[in-house]
Amino acid sequence: MSSYVANSFYKQSPNIPAYNMQTCGNYGSASEVQASRYCYGGLDLSITFPPPAPSNSLHGVDMAANPRAHPDRPACSAAAAPGHALGRDEAAPLNPGMYSQKAARPALEERAKSSGEIKEEQAQTGQPAGLSQPPAPPQIYPWMTKLHMSHETDGKRSRTSYTRYQTLELEKEFHFNRYLTRRRRIEIANNLCLNERQIKIWFQNRRMKWKKDSKMKSKEAL
């Protein structure tokens, strides 16, 4: 039966010229291969090769004009933070390092210096206004100042001269009290702007003068 099928196939198929293999310089090119026609049972089994498309690559692999070999591939991303990815067009925030911190410190110091200079200028401008109105000195009367102060350094005591007001007040006190207590001496010294020693000496001299005058009066009476 196999021989019958083979004979029937041989009779129905037309004479086909032998296929001649040609040597081609470029194996990737299919245009140089001749088309062949085959028939089986009245069916056309011819093989046709489409014209090749322009290619920029070797070994029949097409490459687009775009330098990116894989256009569908997503852009490279950089992890800016955990769980967040940045694209190529996005700029990842830079972490300021030691050099950036050092560069920022001089700017802060300059701002602090400038603010300090401004405050000093304001203080200087405010001073003349305060100096234009000096506080009035307290009024001091003559008996409030300590007079007859010795400034000599030779060891000799200078003779104390009392004012009329001081002499009058001391005479009044001597008329009532010929001997003063220490507490009373301090009060008189403060009132007359004298020291305790000056009051004590004045009363000693005044008592001696009073005794001398009393003796002379007693002699005249005899």
Swiss-Prot record:
Bias kind Low complexity: ranges: 74-85
DNA-binding residues: 155-214
Location in or out of the cell: Nucleus
Biased composition (Basic and acidic residues): 107-122
UniProt entry keywords in alphabetical sequence: Developmental protein, DNA-binding, Homeobox, Nucleus, Transcription, Transcription regulation
PROSITE patterns on file: ANTENNAPEDIA, HOMEOBOX_1, HOMEOBOX_2
CDD domains (UniProt xref): homeodomain (cd00086)
One Gene Ontology biological process: embryonic skeletal system development
Pfam families given in the database record: Homeodomain
Full protein name: Homeobox protein Hox-C5
Molecular function GO labels: DNA binding; DNA-binding transcription factor activity, RNA polymerase II-specific
Location of region: Disordered: 68-141
Task performed by this protein: Sequence-specific transcription factor which is part of a developmental regulatory system that provides cells with specific positional identities on the anterior-posterior axis.
One Gene Ontology cellular component: cell junction
Keyword Transcription regulation set for record: yes
Protein family according to the UniProt entry: Belongs to the Antp homeobox family.
Main location: nucleus
Motif segment (Antp-type hexapeptide): 140-145
